[in-house]
Curated annotation (Swiss-Prot):
Enzyme Commission code: 3.5.4.19, 3.6.1.31
Protein name, entry field: Histidine biosynthesis bifunctional protein HisIE
This protein's GO CC annotations: cytoplasm
Annotated spans, Phosphoribosyl-AMP cyclohydrolase: 1-114
Gene from which the chain derives: hisI
Annotated region (Phosphoribosyl-ATP pyrophosphohydrolase), positions in chain: 115-203
Organism: Escherichia coli O6:H1 (strain CFT073 / ATCC 700928 / UPEC)
């Protein structure tokens, strides 16, 4: 979140009390929407952890998702170099746009975003009926079975690579990634944690 010094340095006078706010997906980097905040909206955003704007049409504070349930959960807030624009990184709950797309700028999602969406779906499957969901059945079988499936798919992926079968390699790699994501969820880990670890190693 913003430090106290950063909040003091925000140039509300320059923006006539309404500061433009760019909301970006914290995982994929996709630009989700543009809105405006006054000081009260910023306070509410920081206090609640959900993106809250000042609606210029309704002339009141408006929390994104207050009607639809499609909230934007705040990860971080940062000012630009001129202190007259804010960048909010957020994890969206559902589509951001009222038209049903992930972004108000159209369906511009990067392919990598699908992994995040798949991960969210796999997390929801934890509470599904094992009789109707393969993923729920996998969770119910326990960690050892899930880990075994990851091992099996890893071997099958490697075998497909050794015979240079690109079609089979694609299929087996897909199975491997799916089961690996299930295993991470089973262990209360997520893809973001793995990405952060890879980033640290790269440094």
């Amino acid at each position: 979140m913003l430090t106290e010094q950063q909040r003091r340095e925000l140039d509300w006078e320059k923006t006539d009390g309404l500061m433009p706010v760019i909301v970006q997906h914290a995982v994929s980097g996709e630009v989700l929407m543009l809105g405006y905040m006054n000081p009260e909206a910023l306070d509410r955003t920081i206090e609640s952890g959900k993106v809250t704007f000042f609606s210029r049409t309704k002339q009141r504070l408006w929390t994104k998702g207050e009607t639809s349930g499609n909230f934007l959960n705040v990860v971080s807030i940062a000012p630009d170099c001129d202190n007259d624009t804010l960048l909010v990184l957020a994890n969206p709950i559902g589509p951001t746009c009222h038209k049903g797309t992930s972004s108000c700028f159209g369906d511009t999602a990067h392919q990598w975003l699908f992994l995040y969406q798949l991960e969210q779906l796999l997390a929801e499957r934890k509470s599904a009926d094992p009789e109707t969901s393969y993923t729920a059945k996998l969770y119910a079988s326990g960690s050892k079975r899930i880990a075994q499936k990851v091992g099996e798919e890893g071997v099958e992926t490697a075998l497909a690579a050794t015979v240079h079968d690109r079609f089979e390699l694609t299929n087996e790699a897909s199975d491997l990634m799916y089961h690996l994501l299930v295993l991470l969820q089973d262990q209360d880990l997520d893809l973001t944690t793995v990405i952060e670890n890879l980033r640290k190693r790269h440094q």
